[in-house]
Amino acid sequence: GRRRMLVAGAVLMALAGLAFAFTSNLLFLVIAGTIGVISPSGNEVGPFLSIEQASLSHLIPPGSRTEVFAWYTLTGSLATALGALFAGVVTQALQRSSMAPVASYRAIVLLYAFLGIVLGMVFTQVSALVEVNHGPDQLQQTSTGNLLGLGKSRNVVLKLSGLFALDSFAGGFVVQSFAAYWFYLRFGAEPKTLGAIFFAANVFAGISALLASRLAIRIGLIRTMVVTHLPSNLLLIAIPLMPTLPLAVVVLLLRFSISQMDVPTRQSYTMAVVEPGERSAAGGFTGVARTTGAAISPLLAGFLFAHPALINIPFYIAGTLKVVYDLLIYFSFRKLRPPEERP
């Protein structure tokens, strides 16, 4: 069931935090990070997202779906912002109190493990109404011949998954941890400064999600995804062209003020164009595709960041690939409208 999967994911999250706190074995850390939903971007990469999206879509009417996803995105962005600010401030405070840098980072991942335990306790209180066998939109169970729970929606989900993998592959070059490292390498920004920068960035991103739902009502989900995501990717390319820290921060904040407007619309669109009984499977497929895409590019980005002359290249690669993604998703899905947009 969905509730049990959410609790299991929270337990894995806690175990991964403990692993990062108490071992330095690289192989073990890679395994723990993979199964324990540790994200270098600060955004969701584990099982929670797909299950939560399917559960929300299961409970709310189509006309309210995008607005609910916007609030869902806002809540997540604000939590990410507070986490970035807290981690930066606490880490620097611990280091100034004579604690070694590695020990200060260990304190943060221990807190991560504790929050995983708290999250698991919260998930045990989730209503049984989120399960597939509840609610008016229940469909017949998919046959065993279907692709891991996908029947009629298979072609749409596979195509979306491929495009989402491309977008995440591009984003993996400039996840927030890499972007923070770039600000450190390029301008010597301290942890406290970096925490403040990404606190503001995530607040901007969260607020923009609410605007996305309003825009989607006017021009549709696919158009909203593209007209907001495309200029944000041009701003991404412009960040390394800025000569000073303040200018680079301004461009970064401008980008974040529109870059996440495609998130609630993308989530809403995915849940809208698949069969209700296949939403969990669709969320899982697209989630795995995004995670897989995002897992590959940091290897390449790490190589580029290891060479001072190449630290700007990840921004150019990411921005260009994301522009390609925007064009592909528009021309591939502009004619497939969600139910609430059909005449």
Where in this protein do the model-derived segments appear?
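Helix-to-loop junctions at the C-terminal end of transmembrane segments
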Residues: 1-2, 91, 208-221, 305-306
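Structural signature of the two symmetry-related core transmembrane helices
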Residues: 4-19, 223-238
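Hydrophobic core of transmembrane alpha-helices in multi-pass small-molecule transporters
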Residues: 15-17, 24-47, 247-261
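Cytoplasmic helix-loop-helix junction between adjacent transmembrane helices
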Residues: 32-76
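Transmembrane alpha-helix termini and helix-breaking/packing motifs in multi-pass membrane transporters
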Residues: 81-103, 181, 185-186, 296-316
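C-terminal membrane-cytosol helix-exit motif in multi-pass small-molecule transporters
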Residues: 87, 113-136, 325-333
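Juxtamembrane intracellular "pre-TM" segments in multi-pass secondary transporters
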Residues: 128-168, 185-189
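Short amphipathic helix-loop junctions that connect adjacent transmembrane helices
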Residues: 177-193
